[in-house]
Structures are given as C-alpha cells and as structure tokens.
From Swiss-Prot:
Transmembrane segments: none
A GO molecular function held by the record: structural constituent of ribosome
Gene Ontology biological-process entries: translation
Protein name from the UniProt record: Small ribosomal subunit protein uS10
Keywords: Ribonucleoprotein, Ribosomal protein
Cited function: Involved in the binding of tRNA to the ribosomes.
Annotated InterPro entries: Ribosomal_uS10 (IPR001848), Ribosomal_uS10_CS (IPR018268), Ribosomal_uS10_dom (IPR027486), Ribosomal_uS10_dom_sf (IPR036838)
Pfam families in UniProt: Ribosomal_S10
NCBIfam families xrefs: PRK00596.1, rpsJ_bact
GO CC terms, sorted: ribonucleoprotein complex; ribosome
Species assigned in the record: Desulfitobacterium hafniense (strain Y51)
C-alpha cells in the first residue's frame, strides 16, 4: 500500500470545525506511521444571495446574504493498512463534508 496516496478534501461552512477535523485527521495519520502533507487551505467559495425586503413594493430596498464554504486539502503519503483502518473509524463533526480519493 506504500505506493498509493490518499487525498482528502474537507468542506464546511464553519472554519473552526473544519480546522479541528483536519487536525484530527493529521494526528491520526501521523500516529499510524504515514507521512502527511497539509492541511492546505483552498480558496473559500462565497455565494451571495440578494432578495427583496418587502413582499410587494419598494424594489430599491434589498437585503444580501452570503454563504462561505471553506475547504482544506490533506495528502497522506505512504499510508499503511493501520492508517486506513484508523481513518475509517475516525468520528468527525456532522457539519464537515469529506471526500476521499485513493
């Protein structure tokens, strides 16, 4: 398994939970003997939604909301079978989206 590389992409709306999850993954991988590159911060996506404040008139009165999606990238180089097992058992918060590629 040493010739493979595991790439983990994390996404979340809250950057604090995202960083805590990334630290948990890095710590688990290092503890099982794998080399880790990251967490690398990727660009933050910012979605802006503009809506009318009034349901009827006053077109000039609008309100804007934004939603930021923070992302991190972690590469696990030279993973062992213990690393994969430990990552599968890892418990992460519900607000963090994880995408794993081998």
């Amino acid at each position: 398994m040493s010739s493979q590389k595991i790439r983990i992409r994390l996404k979340a709306f809250d950057h604090k939970t995202l960083d805590q999850s990334a630290e948990k993954i890095v710590e688990t991988a290092k503890r099982t003997g794998a080399r880790v590159s990251g967490p690398i911060p990727l660009p933050t996506e910012k979605s802006i939604y503009t809506i009318l404040r009034s349901p009827h008139v006053n077109k000039d009165s609008r309100e804007q909301f934004e939603m930021r999606t923070h992302k991190r990238l972690i590469d696990i180089l030279e993973p062992t079978s213990k690393t994969v097992d430990a990552l599968m058992r890892l418990d992460l918060p519900a607000g963090v989206d994880i995408e794993i590629k081998l």
